[in-house]
Amino acid sequence: TVVNEMIAAKTTHRIGGVIRSGQTIDLMGDVLFLGDLHSGATLCASGNIFVMGQVGGVVQAGSQGDARAVVVGDLKGAGQIRIADVVEIVADHYDPDRPVAYLNELHTMTHAGLADLASIRPRLFKQMEAM
C-alpha cells in the first residue's frame, strides 16, 4: 500500500557484516552500513547511505530517482558510486577529506567534506541532529 511505502521510505536501516561479491542488498529508506562491501557486491537504497567500513563494490543511493540522496563514507575502494541516475567510477585521485558524494544543482556528482553536509543538505542534517 501507499502508506507502507511511505513508512519504508522514511526508515533508517542499520545493517552490518559483509556483503560478498555477487550479493545485492536493496532497501527502501536510508542505510547505515557497518561492515565491508566486497568488490562485485552492491548496496542499494532508495535514500541516503552512510558507510563505516571498507567499500569495494557498488554503492547506490537514491535508487528510486531521489537526486537529493547522499553517500557518506570512505569510498576510495568503491567500484562505482551511483546517486539516482548518475554513475561515477571512483578514480585513483579520490580525496579522503571529501567523503560526502552528492549531486549538485547541475546534476553532477560532487564530493565534499563532512562539515559541508549541513549546507549541502540542511534538512538531512537537521534530521540527524534530532536522532
Where are these regions (language model features)?
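Charge-rich, low-hydrophobicity low-complexity segments
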Residues: 1-40, 44, 54-131
